């Protein structure tokens, strides 16, 4: 019997895959046989490009594409390149996201909108443009967050964007079903990687006290969730939010 987690021949795009959870995801998809697309957005210091290059060194013949997910023209160009060079797309993981915490009283409109623009509008734009090259039977996995389910202090922008991704996932699941494309979301809890790095130790211990399983999540537990939702094992799962949070939110 074929390994359901063998992605040989599948084309996989993980947005924001130059570092953090996205980088770990694309590495595992590669190890399981997928043709991988690494996405990053250029920054003034060239750090994101360098990070993407380092990830690409560990992969087998990847595409590496500079694309700002908030710019429709760039996203459309990325999809055209994937279509031209790989013939289509089988699995899309909308992972790109930013965080910028501040209380509502202190948060500027730009601080609110910039996070929503990347996290939510970026997910919409990539999904919309990917529709042109997504093959029948494909998979879309969106990264939400426990913050979007609970509403965390100081995260009006981030929580709002991640809550909206859940609604967007459900709408997308209905609309893409006619192409037998499933659309699901993962809602990570407090994970020991990526944007959580640099959090003060006392804050981390405070988080842990809220988690029934008594520990932070490991990035591989998020990767495993993405693998499952992208695999034939989840062929009858769509419009679902998979909580990977140690029990901090049960709903």
Indicate where each model-derived feature is located.
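The beta1-alpha1 cofactor-binding region of Rossmann-like NAD(H)/NADP(H)-dependent oxidoreductases
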Residues: 66-77, 109, 221
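Active-site helix of classical SDR
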Residues: 127, 161, 169
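Conserved glycine-rich cofactor-binding loop
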Residues: 18-19
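Short C-terminal tail/terminal secondary-structure segment
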Residues: 2-3, 150, 209-210, 227, ...
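Substrate-binding pocket helix/loop in short-chain dehydrogenase/reductase
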Residues: 103-104, 111-113, 196, 207
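Alpha-helical segment proximal to the catalytic Tyr-Lys
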Residues: 132, 174-178, 235
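Residue(s) in the substrate-gating loop at a strand-loop-helix junction
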Residues: 145
């Amino acid at each position: 019997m074929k390994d359901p987690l063998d992605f040989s021949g599948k084309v996989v795009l993980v947005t924001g895959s130059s570092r953090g959870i996205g980088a770990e995801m694309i590495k595992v998809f590669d190890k399981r046989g997928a043709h991988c697309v690494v996405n990053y957005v250029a920054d003034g210091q060239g750090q994101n490009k360098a990070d993407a290059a380092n990830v690409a060194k560990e992969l087998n013949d990847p595409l590496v594409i500079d694309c700002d997910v908030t710019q429709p023209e760039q996203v459309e160009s990325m999809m055209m390149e994937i279509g031209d060079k790989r013939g289509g797309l089988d699995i899309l993981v909308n992972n790109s996201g930013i965080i910028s915490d501040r209380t509502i009283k202190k948060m500027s409109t730009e601080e609110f909108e910039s996070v929503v623009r990347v996290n939510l509008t970026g997910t919409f734009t990539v999904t919309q443009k990917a529709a042109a090259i997504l093959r029948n039977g494909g998979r879309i996995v969106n990264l939400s967050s426990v913050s979007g389910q609970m509403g965390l202090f100081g995260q009006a922008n981030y929580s709002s964007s991640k809550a909206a991704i859940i609604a967007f996932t459900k709408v997308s699941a209905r609309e893409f079903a006619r192409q037998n494309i499933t659309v699901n979301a993962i809602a990570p809890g407090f994970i020991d990687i990526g944007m959580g790095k640099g959090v003060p130790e006392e804050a981390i211990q405070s988080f842990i006290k809220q988690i029934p399983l008594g520990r932070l999540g490991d990035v591989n537990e998020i990767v495993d969730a993405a693998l499952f939702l992208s695999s034939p094992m989840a062929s009858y799962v769509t419009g679902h939010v998979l909580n990977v949070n140690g029990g901090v939110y049960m709903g």
